[in-house]
Amino acid sequence: MPSDTTVPDEYADAALFLGMNSEDEGVRRACKAFFVDRLDGRIVMSLEQVGRCDDIIWGFSRELQDAYYPFMDNLHTVMDIRRLGYEEADVLHATGTELPRSLPVHERLLLGMVRDRKGLLHTASPRLAATTGFAVRAVTGADGPEARFPEPLEDLYQQSLALRVPAEAL
């Protein structure tokens, strides 16, 4: 009997994406390493998680937004990020009894999507990282030299660091 060698789609949430600009240096470096390591691969983000990134960034001054967005825009262009909307089955999983009611609705919707589509969620969210029984992997510390994007993306990333996201926003 052949074994299933299908690699699950890797999902990223807003906490992981914005974690690249975290005030916490360990989180920042780990999240950046995640994206650098997958720059030539593919990840999936729900449309809502992409929108959550914008919602948080829009809370900063126009000057900080202008420093941040060139990096984000370029990363979304050069990296294969599949942005997907929810399907009915995702919502049904999110509203079912198997997902913890202690999680906010947006996180239950994301877990429902990942579970329904048999993916693997990578996150910097302490709440999601503490959730057991689901395909969730918390980003871990990055040892050694800091990972670097190829130029000109690295330069744009360094400029984006004018904006730092507080840990509680992740």
Regions found by a protein language model. Give the residues of each.
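Short His-Asn-centered micro-motif
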Residues: 12, 46-47, 122-125
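Active-site neighborhoods of divalent-metal-dependent phosphate/nucleic-acid chemistry enzymes
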Residues: 80-132, 163-170
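Short, well-structured N-terminal submotif of metal-dependent ribonuclease cores
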Residues: 1-45, 57-66, 147-170
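Active-site regions of enzymes building and remodeling cell-envelope glycoconjugates
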Residues: 133-144
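Short amphipathic alpha-helical segments and helix-helix/interface helices
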Residues: 31-36, 69-72, 109-111, 129
